[in-house]
A protein has these predicted regions:
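HhH-family (HhH-GPD) DNA N-glycosylase catalytic core used in base-excision repair
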Residues: 2-479
């Protein structure tokens, strides 16, 4: 009965049917956290499905596809369940690819610091009216409202979880003045930002910040750590049985990051050292993508289980996550180095590369362009490919359709479809991209008693959409 109800909730979610959403609200199921928000007319607040408060009467509930839509309707966020802590909307929200690309750019700050909607639309190649119509249809709010809500929610998160000065939080959240931040905060939440700091210890500029990132269970933390451990670079990353650590650099500020998982509370804990408040938004975005925090495991499992070969793998490894990238260029370089050699061999060469550059961090595009790469174990062709990638990396625009990005990558010497798809899958976190022509996928199917050709695999993968990346991950597990 529970599984049947889960399927109904998933398949009807996008329509936000009142009875179905209310059933999810009553059960406080964390698997639906962030997939909708409940506006309660009797209190004027909106909540997450997991809110510990008494369940409101159904006639007092209105369901919204985003926090922005709830705020736009006049509701204020609940102080108990704190909607600012909810996982972000799943990447598949709305089947419209333009919406996904626009959301990614907004998350990267495309509408912060006075940047205009017309500039965003120019990058996307569509008109403002059309983009507003798409956002209203899929998210219940305009692009500017979505961007404003994200700024406010991140600021609220920092106010609650850190001791950073309010001025720094305002600027670090994407507001270009403290006055505008205060006005927007009061309008959205009904009180000043300073209210969040009442009865709390004094503001300080500390070298260590702790942030929490809620996720939808289940979460295959052990599987993700295993993937990262096998590929960890000696001078940069440390992966233990329970945590992932790495050195980081944001706009010239060197620091470190340690992430662990609290499965009981369905959240990751990130300890960030020596990174100013102004750059915590960037760090937060990178963490969410690296650990695939906003994935929808219920939807993924539901769709992939239609394939009888994948069904037992999905059951055996619930909550599989797509390993993302701290830095997209790093993954691209490692993908090229890893062409046609083992994971261990690629790791050895990457360690030599990091040691050769000597900064204690993964090399930037400029550093690789100007570096002597001879003697690392790379062929002359690989070196040429790395130099060309470094020269052209900045020209790859996330606003473009993914098909165009794949074509641009494949146009570079030494990069074929496998490498291009792998780069886009991990660097851009694309859930529906997988490395075509990957022999390990064919080996996985063969081990599962389903030998097939590349053409057969391509046809089979059409049934995994929009989760082909996750389907590939499951077959890699089997291989």
């Amino acid at each position: 009965m529970a599984s049947f109800m889960l399927i109904i909730l998933y398949t009807t979610f996008m329509n936000l049917e009142h009875d179905i959403c209310y059933q999810a609200l009553k059960t406080r199921d964390a698997r639906f956290d962030g997939r909708f928000f409940t506006g309660v007319s009797s209190t004027g607040i909106f909540c997450r499905p997991i809110c510990p408060a008494s369940t409101p009467k159904p006639e007092n509930c209105t369901f919204y596809p985003s926090a922005s839509a709830a705020i736009n309707a006049g509701f204020r966020p609940c102080l108990r369940c704190r909607p600012e802590s909810a996982p972000a909307s799943p990447a598949w929200l709305g089947t419209e690819a333009t919406v996904r690309r626009a959301l990614r750019l907004i998350e990267d700050g495309a509408l912060d610091d006075g940047q205009s909607l017309s500039e965003l639309c120019a990058r996307l190649g569509i008109g403002e009216r059309h983009l507003r119509r798409l956002f209203q249809s899929h998210l219940g709010a305009s692009p500017k409202q979505i961007a404003q809500t994200r700024r406010l929610m991140f600021a609220k998160k920092l106010l609650v979880q850190t001791k950073a000065p309010i001025t720094e939080i305002a600027l670090g959240s994407g507001f270009n003045s403290l006055r505008r931040f205060n006005d927007a905060y009061k309008t959205a939440f009904g009180f000043a930002p300073s209210h969040e700091r009442k009865n709390k210890s004094e503001e300080t500029n500390t070298q260590e910040t702790v942030l929490h990132f809620n996720f939808r269970p289940p979460y295959d933390w052990d599987g993700l750590l295993s993937f990262f451990k096998e590929r960890a670079l000696d001078e940069i990353e440390t992966v233990s049985m329970t945590s992932y650590e790495r050195l980081i650099c944001i706009e010239g500020h060197k620091g470190s990051l340690r992430v662990s998982c609290d499965e009981k509370k369905n959240r990751l804990k990130a300890v960030i050292k020596d990174i100013p408040t102004a750059h915590l938004k960037t760090v937060s975005r990178k963490i969410r993508r690296l650990f695939d925090v906003d994935a929808d495991p219920v939807g993924i499992a539901h769709d992939l289980s239609h394939d009888p070969v994948l069904m037992p793998l999905v059951k055996a490894h619930p909550g599989l996550r797509l390993p993302g990238a701290w830095d997209g260029f790093e993954i691209a370089v490692r993908a090229i180095i890893g062409q046609q050699i083992s994971v261990k061999g690629a790791r050895t060469i990457c360690n030599r590369l990091v040691e050769r550059i000597g900064t204690g961090l993964f090399p930037t595009a400029d550093e690789i362009m100007n570096a002597d790469l001879d003697g690392l174990g790379l062929t002359g062709r690989r070196i040429t490919t790395l130099k060309k990638l470094s020269e052209n990396w900045c020209g790859l625009d996330k606003a473009k359709p993914v098909e165009e990005t794949l074509k641009e990558l494949c146009a570079l010497p030494g990069i074929g479809p496998w490498t291009a798809h792998y780069i886009v899958m991990r660097s851009f976190g694309e859930p529906d991209i997988y490395p075509v022509d990957d022999l390990a996928l064919l080996r996985g199917l063969e081990k599962l008693g389903q030998p097939c050709t590349k053409a057969d695999l391509k046809e089979r993968a059409q049934n995994w959409r929009p989760w082909r990346a996750y389907g590939a991950l499951y077959l890699w597990r089997a291989s």
